[in-house]
Amino acid sequence: MPVAALIREEIEIPGNVSVEVNGSEVVVKSGAKVLKRELAFPGIEIKMENEKVVVESTFPKKNQTAMVGTYRSHIQNMIKGVSEGFEYKLVIRYAHFPMKVTFKGNTVIIDNFLGEKYPRTAKVMEGVTVKVNGEEVIVSGTNKEFVGQTAANIEQATKVKGRDTRIFQDGIYIVEKAGKVL
């Protein structure tokens, strides 16, 4: 089976975004928004060439070939995050006990879930904002992974345990993530 001598991925940089590569650290800026990420893997080189970010590996092994594509996706997500941002939409659903969802500090507080006495909490990751508009919760930010993790934390906080989920459908559910309707 022939093996490629060079795996190379190039990422275009939009005009309103600047990218700096310092060794294995990639810094993406657009206005006041800045994302930094350490992308280090043996045998993979990240560099700037002709206003493009180049991720390459010479005589790669299977895992290095996979990581070149992974790093390309990470850098593309960083560029999209600082230029457009990411947004997840969640909906609040309840049958009998109305839930009250509030955002305070770096936690989301869910009161009266299934009539429970004590509130449930969900951690909000750094750099992520949460807005509650009636029955809708909007999670937004520049880092795709942090926005997704925050939305997952909120959804997991209202997970029903020990009951039939076909009957007890109360909870907060992700309905749209990064522009894709689920």
Curated annotation (Swiss-Prot):
Pfam families reported in the protein's UniProt record: Ribosomal_L6
One example GO MF annotation: structural constituent of ribosome
Keywords: Ribonucleoprotein, Ribosomal protein, RNA-binding, rRNA-binding
Gene Ontology cellular-component terms listed: cytosolic large ribosomal subunit
GO biological process, one term: cytoplasmic translation
PROSITE patterns per UniProt: RIBOSOMAL_L6_2
Record has Ribosomal protein as a keyword: yes
HAMAP family reported in the protein's UniProt record: Ribosomal_uL6_A
NCBIfam families given in the database record: PRK05518.1, uL6_arch
Quaternary structure annotation from Swiss-Prot or TrEMBL: Part of the 50S ribosomal subunit.
Biological role: This protein binds to the 23S rRNA, and is important in its secondary structure. It is located near the subunit interface in the base of the L7/L12 stalk, and near the tRNA binding site of the peptidyltransferase center.
Family: Belongs to the universal ribosomal protein uL6 family.
Identification of the protein by name: Large ribosomal subunit protein uL6
Species name: Methanococcus vannielii (strain ATCC 35089 / DSM 1224 / JCM 13029 / OCM 148 / SB)
Lineage, broadest ranks: Archaea, Methanobacteriati, Methanobacteriota, Methanomada group, Methanococci
